[in-house]
Every structure is written in C-alpha cells, then in structure tokens.
Amino acid sequence: MSQTKTAKVRVTLFFILVGGVLAMVAVVTDHWAVLSPHLEHHNETCEAAHFGLWRICTARVAVHNKDKSCEHVTPSGEKNCSYFRHFNPGESSEIFEFTTQKEYSISAAAIAIFSLGFIIVGSICAFLSFGNKRDYLLRPASMFYAFAGLCLIVSVEVMRQSVKRMIDSEDTVWIEHYYSWSFACACAAFILLFLGGLFLLLFSLPRMPQNPWESCMDAEPEH
C-alpha cells in the first residue's frame, strides 16, 4: 500500500475509533431520553426520569415555573436507579409509575450489542492488517464497521419508537420528553462508523489499471 493510502487509512481508522468509543458510551449510559410529567399545581416537585438501554433513574426536582410543566428539566440530586425488570427479574423495578415497551427495549439493547460485536471483530481485522502483506483484511474490517453503524442507527430508531409509544400510552404519567446526550452519542457513532467503514473500503481497494491494455493482474503491486 502506498504511503498516501496508508495515511488515509490511519486517519479513517482514527475516526472509526472515535465512533467506537461513542458507541460504547451510548450503550452503557442512561441518558438516551428524559421524561417528565405534567404538574397539576404550582411549586410542585417534578419527578423527572432519564433512562437508557438497561435501566432508568428518577429524581425529584423542585419546579417554580407557571406553565405547570417539567419540560426540559434535568434530573439532579439524589437519584433512584433500577434496571428494567425484563433484564433483572429478581429486582423490584416498581420504584415509580412507569410503563415500558418490553419488546422495543429488548430489541434496542440486543441490536446495540450486535453493533459492539461488529466493532470488536472489525477492530481485530484492522489490527491484523498491519502485519506483512495483510492489507486485504481492511476490507472485511470496513464492512464490519459499516454493519456496526447500521445496527446502531436501527437501535436508535427502535428506542425512539419505544419512547413515542410510551408517551402516547394512556397508562403512563409521562407526557414530556426530550433526547439527551447518550442518544446524541449513538447518532454521532453511526455517522463515524458507517461513513468510516465506506471510506476504509474505498481506500483498501487495489489500484485500478491506469491504461486500457492493463489488467488488474498486470498492474504494479502496491507496497
């Protein structure tokens, strides 16, 4: 591989590494969405909640605005966190009135785990490609990274649909919501992993013949 392509590959792998770190942060943190109920009286305590793929945390925040809304209130202070019941059946998750979409939650978590698995396998291929004449391993690595990005954006969409159904449900007290920084990390990771995988595939392809009478086999090998 030429020095120019080597430099491009290294820069691309750096951005992919950043995407992998963001994906890991998004999966293990609990700030995908923030939920809050509607207040019936002034000067009430707002029970805001934030949750991720695995657990949910609640905190009571004093609200003094006049619109009786906890919208965009950030949970702070002492928090009460609990894993979703379908991930930890032995733990009581009835710490507050909350309705989850079990199928959506399990699907989003499972797809996110697949994404991390693709990142790990792609990283192994990329690491092995630095050996002598193993540039061909960059091609499967690029595909694994692209698949990881696709899995991550699917997980994001499943989570978004879960929040939407939760808010629209008649059995929940939560009427306000917004997506937080873990959700943003997942979206940024998708962009870096998917585009990084495509660029890595492009840079790892063999040099095309420069003249019509050349074939791929006759072209000068790259070092």
From Swiss-Prot:
Residues annotated as glycosylated: N43, N80
Summary of the knockout phenotype: No visible phenotype.
UniProt GO MF annotations: calcium channel regulator activity; voltage-gated calcium channel activity
Transmembrane regions: 11-29, 110-130, 136-156, 181-205
Cytoplasmic side: 1-10, 131-135, 206-223
PTM (free text): N-glycosylated.
Residues in compartment: Extracellular: 30-109, 157-180
CC annotations in GO: L-type voltage-gated calcium channel complex; plasma membrane; sarcolemma; T-tubule
Domain of life, per lineage: Eukaryota
SS bond list: C57-C81
Keywords recorded for this protein, A-Z: Calcium, Calcium channel, Calcium transport, Cell membrane, Disulfide bond, Glycoprotein, Ion channel, Ion transport, Membrane, Transmembrane, Transmembrane helix, Transport, Voltage-gated channel
Similarity field: Belongs to the PMP-22/EMP/MP20 family. CACNG subfamily.
Assembly, per entry: Component of a calcium channel complex consisting of a pore-forming alpha subunit (CACNA1S) and the ancillary subunits CACNB1 or CACNB2, CACNG1 and CACNA2D1. The channel complex contains alpha, beta, gamma and delta subunits in a 1:1:1:1 ratio, i.e. it contains either CACNB1 or CACNB2.
Protein role: Regulatory subunit of the voltage-gated calcium channel that gives rise to L-type calcium currents in skeletal muscle. Regulates channel inactivation kinetics.
Protein name listed in UniProt: Voltage-dependent calcium channel gamma-1 subunit
Organism: Mus musculus
Gene that specifies this protein: Cacng1
